[in-house]
């Protein structure tokens, strides 16, 4: 990952509108990981990531920034809700399962990359196994010359050509494949996931290496064997070692809803357990060792990004030690009508483009006029102000409502509007949404 902070922000701008402060903070944090890897080994161990706390209302891009960042970094990434965890001793998941899930995500990510690398070798091996099943073994050359062997080779090449052209796809063959019995489902109480995983691994290990003959169509058999060969070509031990390093050096954990475990003033009851979750998170964020399938994982250099709306609580309501472990504070701003307008048109695969392309599959063309987009943005902002502010997610609700009739009758409308597209202008938006937006009681329930 050698992108500069400016390049990272530019890439994030393709998908997320506004929130420049948050983008800059995560871009610097990501670049610092690359800078750290360039340091001498003894100094590298001393440099720890500066964890981030994002503060802002729902639907303004907190989660999306973290998700896009992980994709850019090509790093093991996991998003968790802080409210899903309980302190040790209570029924529920403990916070160490975050790192176990991160380790699983790293293995999955690297395995997909490795399978992609050996794809062509796996295809060749699968092709040979299919041809072996289609053709009898070559006859040993007898007498003078090797005419039968050459003849067999010519036949094989002919079948190979037909196989690649798809002419044999519907032919049925008997082929030996790995015996994968149906997975054993083990129902376990919350907090016992580790034991469940170990039992499932034990049962799957018992059937490893067993083969069985199945009657399959060539196309189906080719896909099955290709996947089997790809898995066989991947070095599992090396994969696990690389996954362990990826988790420790490049892992990113996004903890959402952290404000929900903040202790509010003059509140009692379940808050004891909430504070317990915060205290359990402390060693994880500070740096400790967690036992996973890959072995012992050190969390010292994992980047933690926490986020919360903090409507009913403040960042200062978190326990002081946790505040100290999230040194970078970024405040995300509520969205303005202009932001809504830009969200509808500017990002890569914007909402208007998605709906346009979806309806195009039915042969129906729709066009969003500039005044229509402006009016839609105004309504989204108004409804957010009058009712609950759910940020950009309000646009999904409005667009579904706006295009409900068009989506339902798309096949019929396609023949009527074959010569010109349906225009979504301010008048169209007002006729479908205006009354709902003006009536506060209606918009509270419908929009």
Swiss-Prot record:
One of its GO terms (biological process) is protein unfolding. GO terms for cellular component: HslUV protease complex. ATP binds at residues 17, 59-64, 256, 321, 393. The keyword Hydrolase does not apply. It is found in: Cytoplasm. Keywords: ATP-binding, Chaperone, Cytoplasm, Nucleotide-binding, Stress response. Its main location: cytoplasm. The keyword Cell inner membrane does not apply. GO terms for molecular function: ATP binding; ATP hydrolysis activity; peptidase activity; proteasome-activating activity. SMART domains: AAA (SM00382), ClpB_D2-small (SM01086). It comes from the Bacteria. ATPase subunit of a proteasome-like degradation complex; this subunit has chaperone activity. The binding of ATP and its subsequent hydrolysis by HslU are essential for unfolding of protein substrates subsequently hydrolyzed by HslV. HslU recognizes the N-terminal part of its protein substrates and unfolds these before they are guided to HslV for hydrolysis. A double ring-shaped homohexamer of HslV is capped on each side by a ring-shaped HslU homohexamer. The assembly of the HslU/HslV complex is dependent on binding of ATP. Belongs to the ClpX chaperone family. HslU subfamily. This is ATP-dependent protease ATPase subunit HslU. It comes from Pseudomonas aeruginosa (strain LESB58). The lineage of its organism: Bacteria, Pseudomonadati, Pseudomonadota, Gammaproteobacteria, Pseudomonadales. The gene is hslU.
